[in-house]
From Swiss-Prot:
It is an enzyme of class 2 (transferase). NCBIfam families: branching_enzym (TIGR01515), PRK05402.1 (NF003811), PRK12313.1 (NF008967). Monomer. The keyword Transferase applies. This is 1,4-alpha-glucan branching enzyme GlgB. SUPFAM superfamilies: (Trans)glycosidases, E set domains, Glycosyl hydrolase domain.
Amino acid sequence: MMTQANAYFYDGADVALLNGQYTDVFSLLGMHSANEGKALIVRCFLRNAISVDVISIKDGRKVASLDKVNEQGLFAGTLGRRVKPFLYLLRVEYPLCQLDIVDPYQFDSLLNSDDIYLFGEGSAERAYEFLGANWRQTQGVEGVHFCVWAPNAKRVSVVGDFNHWDDTRHVMRQHLANGLWELFLPNVVEGAHYKFDLVYQNGERHTKSDPMATQMECAPHNASIVPPKAHHSWNDTAWMSKRAATAWHKAPMSAYEVHLGSWRRKGEQGEQYLDYQDLIEQLIPYVKEQGFTHIELMPISEFPFDGSWGYQPVGLYAPTHRFGDANGLKAFVDACHQAGIGIILDWVSAHFPKDPHGLVRFDGTCLYEHEDPRKGTHPDWDTLIYNYDRGEVRSFLLSNACYWLREFHFDGLRLDAVSSMLYLDYSREPGQWLPNAYGGRENLEAISFLQILNQRLYQAFPGICMIAEESTAFAGVTKPTDQQGLGFGFKWNMGWMNDSLSYLGRDPLYRQFHHHQLTFSLMYAYTEQFMLSVSHDEVVHGKGSLLHKIPGDDWQKFATLRAYYGFMWGHPGKKLLFMGCEFGQRNEWNHNQSLDWHLLAYEPHQGVQRWLKDLNHLYQAMPALSVQDYEGAGFSWLDCENSRDSIFTFVRYGLAGDAPLVFVINMTPQLHTGFRIGLPLAGDYREYLNSDSQIYGGSNQGNAGTVVAESLPWQGMAQSALITVPPLGCLVIGPATGLAEAN
């Protein structure tokens, strides 16, 4: 019998298949024409099977019983008089059960030539729809289509719960021209764990997580997970329409940066993360109440190490398991939109970690990264750098950006560590980097990728915001790509942040000698579309909280912090503030625990929180604070040279008919009475905000809510007034009817 059965296989093919060395598996397994088209033959490999019958799917009838070729599980047989291929299943008898298995080797390739072309070209925006694990239906049969890019692998198999992690069971179809491997598996269930088992050219075997997996196991496990079929039903049409019609560079934008794992926790010891439903019920109402327009989430792509805060993602397409599943995340974003809150995602495209189950040497070669460590390794973070010159890598990243914006309705991306992408010598000594083709230090491939990314995303997703964390003086970060810029919508103003926080930490007595640290930013404020950012990076790793940075007793600390926020909200540029800063968190941020919400039992912390809330609401109510953020006409110093008193006075202007606002910021504890300031209009003024008010925890020094202009020219204005300037305080003054008109 064995001799007869072996005739079903080519010479040595059965041995090669059993040893996992037969790569053109579709030419062997499945249904094939035999005997010069006069018969059909079916071959299959099913370990531990006792017998196998071929059943027609159309009528459920048994067509043939296959011969057992050997004890390892090879079966084969001809199908009587049938000569035309048909859909079939294999009825398999095992020692303890009987299973009906739809043979995956009877199906043709499900890949589309256009998709393949765009992927290789570097312009695919939906590569996740054919790469990874996607539910598909072909010839009326439902299953999961697995596909992975591994051009230099000798063999690739899908292994998982559905085949007992047997690497010889489901060898994939190889496409030599483009390096893709695919297999359609009908007998897979939602939630099944899987990986790709790769044989390298040197014979080594390595099991890798799916680079395009949309769900992954939690550490220390790292299997990919077949996604559910159900999808979220969106209810944010009104928001998406409004977003598309909004010019954000002219609109108020106040972002609340959140690390979901430590904003707030639950459990007796605070050991449990809030899930997305908790966040819908707690975070969204809080952000709305505080008046922020946006939430910016620190990275939520799957990452194994909590201490990386998400900045070393291994599953770039998989929302982290920590807070729920993908549909839970979509429900959270949907709820944000229904509450009128935008949501920005922190996106990591500058580097990836070396975890062995991830992208590193994925198919035995440097596929996603550069081979040369002078271009492929980040010395600071011991991570790897994407090869931005490779079309498939660009498609991987471009599709990922589109994935978060299209499938999850995020309102934009904040790109981490853009500076490290732009320069080949970033954090490297001479001799540790390679110049570009022109001998320069600019990473031309990364620059091109960023330009294409921004151009494509702004075109595909109207109303989004693309934000760069870029800490150098690279020109044109927010300049349009058709003018040789990078095409971002906004750039974090790291210069303003460093200067202002340095100033904040100085004793008030000596601030007069560092006055320029708060005025210099206006020298370059209109060179880019800036976002003023006080992010997580400024309150961690020994830097201390904002409150901790400020010298003096508690009264001075809280008063100074309120005045600083007043200056920040009055300064041109969009705003970003890290969670906890809005109520004066005392300890520096710890990702392993909740913020210190108990501090809100104390009035000084309540005062800072109330001050931020009122600043945000004024910011949204008064167009002067946003509509000309990036136009010189929107800002005018009244006095930027009063270093002796450390007082800063300026005016913010809107368009014609918008009420102007005057800011007076005093950064010393000295009270000033009879202090004259210029005013842009005649008439009565009111104190819209006074950070020294008792309701904010101040000493209640001010102007009793009103200021009257007189026709005495001062500071370049035709009108002026004598006012009281509170100690370590911020005043916001405007025409008495301005707020009512704005509302």
